[in-house]
Amino acid sequence: MGAVLRSLLACSFCVLLRAAPLLLYANRRDLRLVDATNGKENATIVVGGLEDAAAVDFVFGHGLIYWSDVSEEAIKRTEFNKSESVQNVVVSGLLSPDGLACDWLGEKLYWTDSETNRIEVSNLDGSLRKVLFWQELDQPRAIALDPSSGFMYWTDWGEVPKIERAGMDGSSRFVIINTEIYWPNGLTLDYQERKLYWADAKLNFIHKSNLDGTNRQAVVKGSLPHPFALTLFEDTLYWTDWNTHSILACNKYTGEGLREIHSNIFSPMDIHAFSQQRQPNATNPCGIDNGGCSHLCLMSPVKPFYQCACPTGVKLMENGKTCKDGATELLLLARRTDLRRISLDTPDFTDIVLQLEDIRHAIAIDYDPVEGYIYWTDDEVRAIRRSFIDGSGSQFVVTAQIAHPDGIAVDWVARNLYWTDTGTDRIEVTRLNGTMRKILISEDLEEPRAIVLDPMVGYMYWTDWGEIPKIERAALDGSDRVVLVNTSLGWPNGLALDYDEGTIYWGDAKTDKIEVMNTDGTGRRVLVEDKIPHIFGFTLLGDYVYWTDWQRRSIERVHKRSAEREVIIDQLPDLMGLKATSVHRVIGSNPCAEDNGGCSHLCLYRPQGLRCACPIGFELIGDMKTCIVPEAFLLFSRRADIRRISLETNNNNVAIPLTGVKEASALDFDVTDNRIYWTDISLKTISRAFMNGSALEHVVEFGLDYPEGMAVDWLGKNLYWADTGTNRIEVSKLDGQHRQVLVWKDLDSPRALALDPAEGFMYWTEWGGKPKIDRAAMDGSERTTLVPNVGRANGLTIDYAKRRLYWTDLDTNLIESSDMLGLNREVIADDLPHPFGLTQYQDYIYWTDWSRRSIERANKTSGQNRTIIQGHLDYVMDILVFHSSRQAGWNECASSNGHCSHLCLAVPVGGFVCGCPAHYSLNADNRTCSAPSTFLLFSQKSAINRMVIDEQQSPDIILPIHSLRNVRAIDYDPLDKQLYWIDSRQNSIRKAHEDGGQGFNVVANSVANQNLEIQPYDLSIDIYSRYIYWTCEATNVIDVTRLDGRSVGVVLKGEQDRPRAIVVNPEKGYMYFTNLQERSPKIERAALDGTEREVLFFSGLSKPIALALDSKLGKLFWADSDLRRIESSDLSGANRIVLEDSNILQPVGLTVFENWLYWIDKQQQMIEKIDMTGREGRTKVQARIAQLSDIHAVKELNLQEYRQHPCAQDNGGCSHICLVKGDGTTRCSCPMHLVLLQDELSCGEPPTCSPQQFTCFTGDIDCIPVAWRCDGFTECEDHSDELNCPVCSESQFQCASGQCIDGALRCNGDANCQDKSDEKNCEVLCLIDQFRCANGQCVGKHKKCDHSVDCSDRSDELDCYPTEEPAPQATNTVGSVIGVIVTIFVSGTIYFICQRMLCPRMKGDGETMTNDYVVHSPASVPLGYVPHPSSLSGSLPGMSRGKSMISSLSIMGGSSGPPYDRAHVTGASSSSSSSTKGTYFPAILNPPPSPATERSHYTMEFGYSSNSPSTHRSYSYRPYSYRHFAPPTTPCSTDVCDSDYAPSRRMTSVATAKGYTSDVNYDSEPVPPPPTPRSQYLSAEENYESCPPSPYTERSYSHHLYPPPPSPCTDSS
């Protein structure tokens, strides 16, 4: 920057020597200086690399340059001699700072903002910022200062354009120009002449006037294209012009001497004469001691010529000099992605953004006046946070077990924090620092939202917008709950208390009312019911109720007695909660205020007095003040929750805060980890969480049916469970990994499960046909029956000290006991109504009774001393005592997992065995495991299973793969051990590892669920090339995609094709597929690139739905679902036989595994197999498997054989498709949209042939006439013109050669087929009303002797006798017509001969080819007709001898074959190809024009798109808005979004910057509120929907595209 400094100093010196100044201007991307006398030279860049610099000014005396950047929404500065050092001056609260001016005397910075419509001032460093003007401003732009007189001037180009003047202290505001003005842009002052100059870009003039607006005169008029900024130096005016991209100048008096100073400016913006003369020195009234002001000292036009002022929101004290210490009353506002504060002390109501990070979806907000913390909830971060009022000291308060915290309230007296959670449906409390958390209310809550507290009385109030909306009240400890209002409510969103008058106010977003009542529910009345379309946030302070409105995008307030309303903030989107508060005033007290009421943890005040409470995991001891961690306690599970009860006190049970529990059944714990485990038979999961409810996770999610029994192996850290539905006992690690089936044979409804890890035994009960209690080693071995004669035993538990078993018998209603061998049975209790769960601790047994709805206790040996521990409990499923004595002992698995790689399973006599996950095998070291290499995979609708044929292993397990919705087909890559499947719901191909990890979308629709682009049907993997071949039901093609998701392209496509099932044989280079063409299904074979296509079978098929092949046996298998049979053949199609056709109902999948062919029958829900050798016949493999969809065999991969495949290494060197030829070498090929290049390895773009041409895939010939395509003769060197030829349509006749002709030409006496097959076997009988021509042709009898030849042999006009003399005129007419026809025919024939045979053909290099052709064409050439080769002479290399040439400008008026489909290029010039290969005919001389880019409908850019700083926008500087149009409406301008409409509806919504249109069908069902309203200023690129579709669940907004809906929805827990 040294050169810049030297230039600046030199130029500044020049200014002193001559009258021409340096001009400082903004160029959007940089700031520059240019010499006004030599503007043709390059300008000097002062600051570069800017985003969108608009306004610029300077303080010459301090060497500072300031500019505004509208893209970064900031004002910045730099020093002359340090221009590489850029400082931020103002970075918040700006949207479009269009104007900027420096007060060089008072050292202040003034600016205009055309988005916020404010004029502000601050110190030169950006501190002590103050809003001067905020009313009656509409698009303020240029601003100029006159510090010596204390005046400021600005332009306003809004609805009422004008130029105003005011004191620099905000006083004496006056409009000085308001006529003949439209777009006043530039503004400058002549300090010597006391004149005001301005430029109008619409009216194209520069005018001047006195500083008070009088004596207005034109300086330049009519010759200004688009003046923008204006400055003055001595006698010359300078301005920037947007149209000419230049700086111009003229005489300031006369306007003469108009000239261009500097041109070729990228985007000229603001401009100033950079000179000390433009900032003359004068007396500074603020120069001494800042004028005595504590904060701001601003110039004023009235004595004493200055005025003290305070920063925004702060009042000036009565002495007129000193500002108060901040605002005394604030309005705190939560927006979606930021928090703001608004001072209620001053009338400007300026919102100031707090400098906080990572706010994603703030909802509720509250304030603690004692410590000065703001508290807020974030629905997306799922946390409660706090910070000081200036944004500093940000902390996370609560982060665990938070779902959707919609309401928050501070108890400033007891120092507690309350919140509602509409995800967990709970109201909870904690200390203000987030410790000592406790659930207060968790029952009968649907959608709790707003919550307020009255610490002085001891009540809390909350709203619930569930199915039955209501407002409730309870004591601060959750007791004494009562409903205050439950009628005439819709969406009660907001709630506020008036402590002085004892009333409670609320706002309803559905009824659109603000109502009030007494705190006891009496005296209900309406305060406001007009123009409040959607209330959300709600608060009260003093005499005013404040609220936010989503739809109006506003904050308003109403006087609580007079009902007078006032808008505080308008057009601010994403409004959520708000809180009006006194900053320091603290009201009220209660006994909890002093020493926390004597409580060790929580002090909760009630109307009856304080109550000490304990957080989760603690219990209150006898003094009722102190909380301790109990040594032991009872845990029990009910349907929807898990609770605990103290064994030492009489306190009520306490719910453990767990979310999402549906139907908890079995329960256990791990005392060392302080976790609980439970099964959920509704969710079909096994879950765990810490005792405080945190870190909840599902450890087993797949393959469960009714997991009624479960137990924790606390030594081996394993989890055991019994599944009554699947009849299995399984084990895994505590985190669900390494799952293995231990017992599956001869199990009949296993139920309760108990473990004795120290001894190595497990015990379980069975409820089947012969109920019993069994025992086995913990690895599943040594199974034996202990108690055979028993009813349905449940609650099996072990007394580890006395070595006895206990259980309840549901059939006899007894509690019994035996020793560990099942002997010495004793009845402990016999007069029980309905005992169910059971546990033991010390000298007692504890059980649940469903009839008594109780938990009871009795002596474990005698059954005496029975006591009811807890009553009024419905359907307690399981019970246990949480204590370390229940998990004692030791075995070798407790130490380093027994050094096992996976599972360590205890066995009797202190031993252990290492276990492996299901289907894994234990290695010779007896420690480690190996994954299976050979197995079967089969899929169901929402699961994929693995099966092994091993008597020692459980046959099948469900793989833990998430998000399976509708699995249609599966395949497996044995190299990477990745599973691939088609999801027909998402219309995608996905892959994942067997353990569910590394999930990935391989092929997916770009637009989900609408206008489906793809619809995969079947897939097959080429493991050598690493490709997936898949058929698409939507586009009817065979597509190829790399395993990493990169597309290769379509390899097979035909007009009539319907490829469905597919299997590849990469060892031979072929693929086989079913082609379900209408009325003619086929099984076909083609090379892997789609060439060499042949039909193997077209008869004896109805719906061939599945394919399989065995490459080693050389066999192809298929299943026909309509014919209900399975067939096979050789891979060539020979030796077709029916393998099985009996008792097959709906075969949908086939696979070959060893010597067996496996298939799945969807209707019979069965997997079967048949021995292909015929020795063992047909066998059922597994039955009762619902919703089967596919099956696939995985064989062990021989790496040596794999590496020998020529395509396995780098895809054989091919860029796309690698095929194996018969000799074992490779051939590279390409998908249909590409062609093979000359290196015969790489694919590239095809040559550009005309629409009337066909592009050969490879070879030296690029283009041939499309009429030669599929004509039975090969012209392309690679024969590609005769590949994939379409089947003739019903209206056509297929010649023996495959050529298609019009069916009407069959047997017409002329050979239209090149092989003349259309005239063979033509013995046809004509109808009664037809005449038979001599050649066999049939024509209507009325055409006989009608003077018109109808038979091709003219036989219809032979032997005719005229009946009357023809009129001469008619004869002349007929003759004329015939003459015309003959003339046309002769001309056409000559033209055809010229074009086809005689005209020279151009090579690719432009040389003339001299081959001549003679065509003997028929009298008429039907569309698509190609002459027989015998009628042609001449030949070309690579074409059939005697082939005719058809010009690209065909005389037949159109293409004679299918359109060019390999390159999909239309409208391109054939001469544009870079290929040097030959073309069969000359290129079109004048190629068609290229497609034009559609122009924007708007030629004028829109401005800064949002009123919200948080909204991301990409725009350039906005010149003008369309101010004569109304601003965009809100997404729903009436209550249409709030009112009733169907939850399921079709909606079309189009939004532009000028408004919205929507098409919505409504009915009477309530729905959530509309999305958060957008700003008035919308980007032209943005599209917004109006009312969103109604969610079907409470969490429909979980993606946070919109604020949380207050619609009545289903419970989300």
Swiss-Prot record:
InterPro entries: 6-blade_b-propeller_TolB-like, Cueball_EGF_LRP_Nidogen, EGF-like_dom, LDL_receptor-like_sf, LDLR_class-A_CS, LDLR_classB_rpt, LDrepeatLR_classA_rpt, LRP5/6. It is found in: Cell membrane; Endoplasmic reticulum; Membrane raft. Pfam families: FXa_inhibition, Ldl_recept_a, Ldl_recept_b. The modification Phosphoserine is found at residues 1420, 1430, 1490. Residues 20-275 are annotated as: Beta-propeller 1. Residues 1-19 form the signal peptide. It is a single-pass type I membrane protein. A motif (PPPSP motif B) lies at residues 1527-1534. Homodimer; disulfide-linked. Forms phosphorylated oligomer aggregates on Wnt-signaling. Component of the Wnt-Fzd-LRP5-LRP6 complex. Interacts (via the extracellular domain) with WNT1; the interaction is enhanced by prior formation of the Wnt/Fzd complex. Interacts (via the beta-propeller regions 3 and 4) with WNT3A. Interacts (via the beta-propeller regions 1 and 2) with WNT9B. Interacts with FZD5; the interaction forms a coreceptor complex for Wnt signaling and is inhibited by DKK1 and DRAXIN. PANTHER family: LOW-DENSITY LIPOPROTEIN RECEPTOR-RELATED PROTEIN 6, VITELLOGENIN RECEPTOR-LIKE PROTEIN-RELATED-RELATED. Belongs to the LDLR family. The YWTD-EGF-like domains 1 and 2 are required for the interaction with Wnt-frizzled complex. The YWTD-EGF-like domains 3 and 4 are required for the interaction with DKK1. The PPPSP motifs play a central role in signal transduction by being phosphorylated, leading to activate the Wnt signaling pathway. This is Low-density lipoprotein receptor-related protein 6. It comes from Mus musculus (Mouse). The gene is Lrp6.
